[in-house]
């Protein structure tokens, strides 16, 4: 499990965080311990039988690990039943299987944390042309809302180190027999 680009425990991941993962079929002989999926469930989600995760990571980790950033195109006011401010971005970097590979709108609001130079900024710090990283959560009506926006690498690196130290403290408190740092 990775969060903010560093190893994490599931307890470190806030509820609702949009995650990416790699999954396997159960080990031979373990299939009986897992409830079987109905034909209807498998039709809706053909990958549902792959239920053993060997990698889970948040958006900032997933995209930065693969060399992807986002370029801000601007903001616009959304419409519909729950109008919210939208951050218009386009992907910068390689095409990623299982990722967002076209320009997209992310919901932003006053609860979105915007980081620059290791400090919290307000929405006025967002400018077209900036290259950013984001963490997402599920918004209303199947939209993706931003929880965090990092306007520079320094801020994301600081978050990565904070998470790494949190994970090391957890491992030490659980008496892991050895650790190579």
Regions found by a protein language model. Name each.
Residues 2-181:
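Short, flexible, surface-exposed loop segments at domain boundaries
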């Amino acid at each position: 499990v990775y969060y903010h680009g560093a190893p994490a425990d599931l307890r470190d991941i806030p509820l609702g965080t949009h995650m990416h993962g790699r999954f396997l079929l159960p080990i031979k002989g373990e299939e009986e311990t897992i409830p079987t999926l109905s034909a209807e469930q498998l039709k809706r989600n053909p990958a549902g039988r792959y239920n053993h995760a060997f990698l889970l990571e948040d958006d900032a980790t997933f995209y930065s690990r693969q060399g992807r950033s986002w370029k801000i195109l601007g903001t616009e006011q959304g419409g519909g039943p729950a109008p919210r401010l939208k951050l218009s971005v386009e992907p910068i970097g390689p095409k990623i299987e299982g990722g967002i590979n076209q320009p997209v709108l992310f919901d932003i609001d006053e609860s979105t944390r915007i980081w620059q130079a290791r400090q919290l900024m307000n929405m006025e710090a967002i400018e077209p042309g900036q290259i950013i990283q984001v963490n997402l959560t599920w918004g209303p009506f199947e939209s993706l809302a931003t929880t965090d926006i990092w306007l520079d690498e320094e801020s994301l690196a600081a978050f990565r180190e904070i998470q790494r130290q949190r994970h090391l403290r957890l491992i030490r408190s659980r008496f892991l027999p050895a650790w190579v740092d």
